[in-house]
């Protein structure tokens, strides 16, 4: 089960308070996802794309959810997240994302790049986890 709560007094003209829960289930079923890579940590030292999770063609049509967080405390050090060479988002220091991952082919790798990284900025810690339904999902990180 994944829960997200958004609360803000100043994002709109009126206060915003949204909370929703989703049960992470297998594709086309009511059975919960039962596999995970566990929480992993890498220290990014590159402004070029690095494979965080490698796509597996057998993963197409199976349910998978991905969690990624930029653990940097410096808001200017952001990560660019791509799938199949398409940018899906940027995570600034402290930002995170949780999204479904459909592996349509082996080019659907999830890659990260430390966009503003230089050797002077030091490592950018990134944590991630894959929740999935099939034991054939493997990561290379």
Protein language model regions, located:
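C-terminal interaction-tip segments
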Residues: 1-13, 24, 116-141
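N-terminal low-complexity, intrinsically disordered "leader/linker" segments enriched in small/polar
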Residues: 1-56
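Hydrophobic beta-strand residues in large extracellular and virion-surface proteins
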Residues: 4, 42, 68, 79-81, ...
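Hydrophobic beta-strand segments within beta-rich accessory/binding domains
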Residues: 49-55, 64-70, 111-115
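Short, surface-exposed beta-strand/strand-loop-strand elements in extracellular ectodomains
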Residues: 60-65, 69-88
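Intrinsically disordered, low-complexity Pro/Gly/Ser/Thr-rich segments with frequent PxxP/GP/PP motifs
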Residues: 86-107
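Noncatalytic modules at the cell exterior or secretory-pathway interfaces
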Residues: 102-123
């Amino acid at each position: 089960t994944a829960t997200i709560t958004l609360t803000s007094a100043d994002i709109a003209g009126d206060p915003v308070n949204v909370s929703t829960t989703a049960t992470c289930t297998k594709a086309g079923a009511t059975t919960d996802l039962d596999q995970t890579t566990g929480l992993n940590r890498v220290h990014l030292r590159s402004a070029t794309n690095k494979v965080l999770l490698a796509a597996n063609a057998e993963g197409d049509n199976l349910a998978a959810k991905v969690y990624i967080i930029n653990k940097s405390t410096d808001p200017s050090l952001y990560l660019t997240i791509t799938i199949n060479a398409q940018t899906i988002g940027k995570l600034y220091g402290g930002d995170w994302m949780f999204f479904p991952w459909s592996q349509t082919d082996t080019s659907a790798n999830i890659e990260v790049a430390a966009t503003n990284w230089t050797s002077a900025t030091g490592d950018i810690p990134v944590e991630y986890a894959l929740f999935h339904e099939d034991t054939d999902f493997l990561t290379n990180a």
